[in-house]
Amino acid sequence: MASLIYRQLLTNSYTVNLSDEIQEIGSTKTQNTTINPGPFAQTGYAPVNWGPGETNDSTTIEPVLDGPYQPTSFNPPVGYWMLLSPTTAGVIVEGTNNTDRWLATILIEPNVTSQQRTYTIFGVQEQITVENTSQTQWRFVDVSKTTQNGSYSQYGPLLSTPKLYAVMKYGGRIHTYSGQTPNATTGYYSATNYDSVNMTTFCDFYIIPRSEESKCTEYINNGLPPIQNTRNIVPLALSARNVISLKAQSNEDIVVSKTSLWKEMQYNRDITIRFKFANSIVKSGGLGYKWSEISFKPANYQYTYMRDGEEVTAHTTCSVNGMNDFSFNGGSLPTDFVISRYEVIKENSYVYIDYWDDSQAFRNMVYVRSLAANLNSVTCTGGDYNFALPVGQWPYMTGGAVSLHSAGVTLSTQFTDFVSLNSLRFRFRLAVEEPSFAIMRTRVSGLYGLPAANPNNGREYYEIAGRFSLISLVPSNDNYQTPIANSVTVRQDLERQLGELREEFNALSQEIAMSQLIDLALLPLDMFSMFSGIKSTIDAAKSIATNVMKKFKRSSLASSVSILTDSLSDAASSVSRGSSIRSVGSSVSAWTDVSTQITDVSSSVSSISTQTSTISRRLRLKEMATQTEGMNFDDISAAVLKTKIDKSVQISPTTLPDIVTEASEKFIPNRAYRVINNDEVFEAGTDGRFFAYRVDTFEEIPFDVQKFADLVTDSPVISAIIDFKTLKNLNDNYGIGKQQAFNLLRSDPRVLREFINQNNPIIRNRIEQLIMQCRL
């Protein structure tokens, strides 16, 4: 059987220890070498004055005032004050437990007569009457309601000169401040599930532990302490005082400071960012009515543009984060239109654009400070994508739009096919725009965001104009270059290769012929035949096998075998020590791991689904230990892996160990196993689903967890290649005899091949589903 490859890897993986020891000895023999670098040596650090360094101890000191943090939405920890520091009037914070408390705080500027204003609270426009008769102090007002559709009431105003406010979750209550500074005091609101209250802030805030509540009260009444600023004193010649200060221009290089070896250069640049989205559309196997995935993926774009009369060559990489997964299911029939998953970016998503150009600013970008950028916004609108069905009108996805707004800039590294580039990463927050998107000829409509189906809408690129400024530490002599701190390493390059290889492997699932797959699954694949398709020399075959085993030794499957071996060893010890039947039953539970849960059902906190799922996770190892004549999931997994290795054009000796290990862990994640007891069958899956039924009628019977656990220990475990639902569907539509049913229950490969050769749609659809689960 094809799963022989996994057994060989598990059996022989210990032999790589010798290879590890040889490498370790070789490395230690070459480490004790002393080199005198002379008075000048290249280091990986900027020139600094070295002090004594840090002195570490075991004391952890919690800061009194932690921050400031930018506006965000999160669940604050219990027992910590959130000190809010707003700059403008309006809603500054809102929070709810989504049950019986909706609370928001509004800041009102001084000298406001009673008037009605419109505020957006929890995404809804609310009309609230506010006033502030104070001529100098700002007024904080809490507005609260106890039902989602109720009206807001005002509580606990705080008149504040420092313009600070604080909120804390503690003791089943939400604590705030009220009164008038400098004599403000704390108050509270009761709330159920107070620890799950999510807070959304619309201003900068600080975090103060409850143990320092007196400090928080001091800040509320008197204001924050002055932030300590570092001041550098630089001696200047008298003649330097006559230098006229000039305003920085759009594109210029300014020498900020200079020593004999290093100088600080300020680079100001106008930039034009062009980018595009890329996507991956994967169609499921079968009759052509189903799509498994429509997703975003990073996109590189290279272009040129003019800046101050100079042609600039630029390179961008666009990637997205925080995607929203949507799906559409038109029905359960093989001819029903289905999209298992399609990604949409919305207001909770981010777009990252890494930018590099060939100007002087990026030549020595290693040590950088004072990085800032101003960029315009851009709107991205989705286009149409047709789902080409074999028969009938084609559904198509259309519309969708988001606008990108600058949210910060950091340093990054772009990895191209040939070189790594130290770049600037511009982060953009998103806002949804009109139009909404829909899947025409279905009932999906009026959804907002930008789907991955056609995010560029026929455009070659989107464009953003702006400027950035940074100060970089570079050598004083322009002919020298600093070392690239984030250059391509072997591992980073390997990760890029693995990413491309995973995409190729997943796309190859549609090219596998099922009849050939069954034949291949029956072959005893060993390491030589499995890796024979790799383009490599015979001399490298041993090193390939060694590297695969070395990687496989650290896989979750190998770890499970090791844990199970320890469990069986402990079980054997307990059998030898105990003489009662119960001690023997408990010791054998290394296979099931739920005997203690089943012993007393009344005290068990786990459901049947949880228990069967727990047992099922061990059944793969049980099946490996007790081979049967039937085909199992690992046979199909290994056959698909072999087919994809032979078809792949990107597989190499360096990527093979990772691919084989990932395949053993990730191929066919949803598995079901069965045990047969006379005419009764017990079947349980790793997803928690379980069935018990009779062979002759496929009539379901009550599922006895204790009996199932006993049978798992004493009987052969069989992969449910054709699961119960497929068997019942086959019997209802075609009718199968008792002997045929037994053969399918035992996963007899001869019977499976007959059904596939007869083009039975139910069996073919089941095998196709298993093939499509072979994804990395």
From Swiss-Prot:
A motif (DGE motif) lies at residues 308-310. InterPro entries: ConA-like_dom_sf, Rota_A_VP4, Rota_VP4_MID, Rota_VP4_MID_sf, VP4_concanavalin-like, VP4_helical. Residues 389-409 are annotated as: Hydrophobic. Gene3D superfamilies: 1.20.5.170, 2.60.120.200. It comes from the Viruses. A motif (YGL motif) lies at residues 448-450. Pfam families: Rota_VP4_MID, VP4_haemagglut, VP4_helical. One of its GO terms (cellular component) is host cell rough endoplasmic reticulum. In group A rotaviruses, VP4 defines the P serotype. Some rotavirus strains are neuraminidase-sensitive and require sialic acid to attach to the cell surface. Some rotavirus strains are integrin-dependent. Some rotavirus strains depend on ganglioside for their entry into the host cell. Hsp70 also seems to be involved in the entry of some strains. Belongs to the rotavirus VP4 family. This is Outer capsid protein VP4. It comes from Rotavirus A (isolate RVA/Cat/Japan/FRV64/1989/G3P5B[3]).
